Regions:
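Domain-level detector of nuclease and nuclease-like folds
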Residues: 1-169
Length: 169
């Protein structure tokens, strides 16, 4: 009921489309611990495009590490009687550790009616996502490898160049 008439979708952090491997996983992905208020144009647009591409990359590369979450700020609003906090933005961090050399990418998306944009336009170094979230994503890696992976991003190593845009239906 917190989401009803709030203007926000129930955005899944781990997409339901990724949970088809198990009825239990599919059921679990609908718990509110996996759901956050997400602007409809973001959720049904470029965020969906990124979810689909992430699935493709996982198949193409054999395995990738994926971390997804909200970015909160001091000015966040809330919705509903339970005062569900509305994130200012969302992130996704990817690591393909099997490629030589390994590669990583961060994505940051404002939780607004920004429009479709491109995946390349939202791709940032992992360091930028760490600055926005306060999370050290690759802390277990040797510092030299961590610095190499987090300090820059090469969109051409991830994106095929077909624009990677999506206008919501």
């Amino acid at each position: 009921s917190d989401y009803r008439r709030s203007g926000y979708d129930r955005g899944h952090l781990a997409p339901a489309a990724d949970m088809r491997f198990s009825p239990e996983a599919m059921r679990d992905c609908f718990y509110y611990s996996n759901i956050v208020p997400q602007h409809p144009r973001l959720n049904r647009g470029i965020w969906l495009t990124l979810e689909n591409r992430t699935r493709q990359w996982a198949k193409e590369y054999g395995a990738i590490f994926i971390t997804t979450g909200p970015v909160y700020s001091s000015g966040d609003t809330t919705i509903g009687n339970n005062q569900v906090r509305v994130p200012a933005a969302f992130y996704k961090v990817l690591l393909d550790y099997r490629s030589r050399p390994p590669k990583a990418a961060g994505f940051l998306f404002p939780n607004t009616d920004e429009g479709p944009g491109t995946l390349a336009g939202h791709m940032v170094p992992v360091d930028a996502v760490e600055a926005a979230t306060g999370i050290d994503f690759f802390a277990a890696l040797p510092d030299s490898v961590e610095a190499l992976l987090e300090g820059s991003v090469n969109p051409a190593s991830w994106l095929s160049g077909e624009g990677e845009t999506h206008e919501p239906q």
